[in-house]
Amino acid sequence: MKRDNRYCLVCLPRNRTIYFHQNEDGKVWLFCNKCDRGYSLEQYCEIADIDLTEFLTGDFHMQEAKPDEVQAMAWPSTFIPLSDPRAARGVEYVKSRGLKPDGDMYYDMKEDGVVFPYYVDNHFCGAQVRFVDVRIDEDGKEWKITTLPGTRLGLLFGMWNQAKLFPNIKAVVVCEGYFNALALQQAFNTKYGGISNNPWKCIALSGSSVSEHQAESLKDLKDQGYKVIAAPDTDGAGLKMLAKMKEKDCITHYSLTNDTEKDWNNLLQDIGHDELAKFFMKSIRSINE
């Protein structure tokens, strides 16, 4: 008889508390109601001290997430504000990137990384964690970031909860990664003397892929009269992202670093906030050019 994997091996409850789900990329993750957190299969087996192969021989009861919905999550207890003294390593890392430790970032005490949270309206719906120290995965490749299980990146934007934009916003800048969006946001906040005077809203796709939901959301902003400016990396993946956004008719302009080795955060480290804002604005081109 197969072991019922719905009994959590971490908190050891008397009843079934685990629910299994599958992301768009086919990866399986689980959520324990009593632990009040999600796990990837690898995380769970490591914490529960069980061999992954042995665990996979057990019985699974899959519950598919609905295709166009995100789920509100409980805030993990290991996520703490950067103002907390225990977050010193996170603050040091953010500063090493030329960034100010301002904005909606946190520190994950367990993973030793900077947390980028995702929201829809006022609901926390997931996060990514950028490790302070780069790790090496089982295939020998660099591993820089992990995603909180259950986070549906294709339905979310970094630094935008998909609510109505503030009245002062006139243009939306769409970057690949959170640090790039944050670099540009801080640059424009500096230029305009604060966020309340800044007409630019910088957001992130969390990668170079543009989902149908993200494209539709950006096209809606464009149709409302906002300038929507793609700001991908100047590499193969970034240029493919730009081409797809043009094809989806969800942008009005684009801006590139024109350096295959440097993204917007790299430029910030080189030239500072004021000069980055100037450089970006001078680099803006219409998609019709």
Segments from the language model and where they lie:
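A generic alpha-helix surface/boundary motif
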Residues: 39, 88-89, 178
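TOPRIM metal-binding catalytic domain and adjacent DNA-binding surface shared by DnaG-type primases
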Residues: 1-15, 46-125, 162-167, 282-289
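Phosphate-handling DNA/RNA-contact segment within nucleic-acid enzymes
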Residues: 111-224
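Broad, structure-driven detector of short, well-ordered beta-strand segments within folded domains
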Residues: 16-24, 107, 128-130
